[in-house]
Amino acid sequence: MRPLIIGIAGGTGSGKTTLVENLKEQFGADISVLPNDNYYAAHHDMSLEERQTLNYDHPAAFDTDRMIQDLEDLKAGKTVQCPVYDYAIHDRTEATLTLAPNKVILVEGILIFENKALRDLMDIKIFVDTDADVRILRRILRDVKERGRTLESVMEQYLTTVKPMHEQFVEPSKRYADVIVPEGGKNLVALMMIVQRIAYHIEHGDVVDEQ
């Protein structure tokens, strides 16, 4: 069975991860997740202070070529070794994450629709669309609680890079989406539609015809 590859994009704090977690809870072992954040480029030659000043919301921040190769390998039925990114040190670690091919692969991240070669590997493209005020509040809570950031650093990053990069790259990529989901995982109607499509694929092995 060729995997069903679903891209889930949207701005920071939009609810992408909540949607992914809801789908994983629904289908368990039949779903694997390939997060865009794992593919932040390595900067071992920089100090922590230098890495903290980088723009992590620009397409150049990601090792997209490696992500494309890993997704192609998964699509071909091969197991891949995904990089692992550590938010505390703002760098890729030496560890890798083993990801085996699966019936469904969820590709999740803010910029996964920006690159044509990457989005062309996806059978279904979903954009999670959430109000900017809600997104920034969620980002503050996440980065302070889960990633050890200060409120001041989160706000500075949002104003200097996150917001302008969202307007330049993330929001325009919405036009490539097959489905736009307001409020992410909290949109139960959209969630059930996606669940039904995945369930059909798992049962019948049917995927969208290749272009």
Predicted features and spans:
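Phosphate-binding/switch loop-helix module in NTP-utilizing enzymes
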Residues: 70-105, 199, 205-206
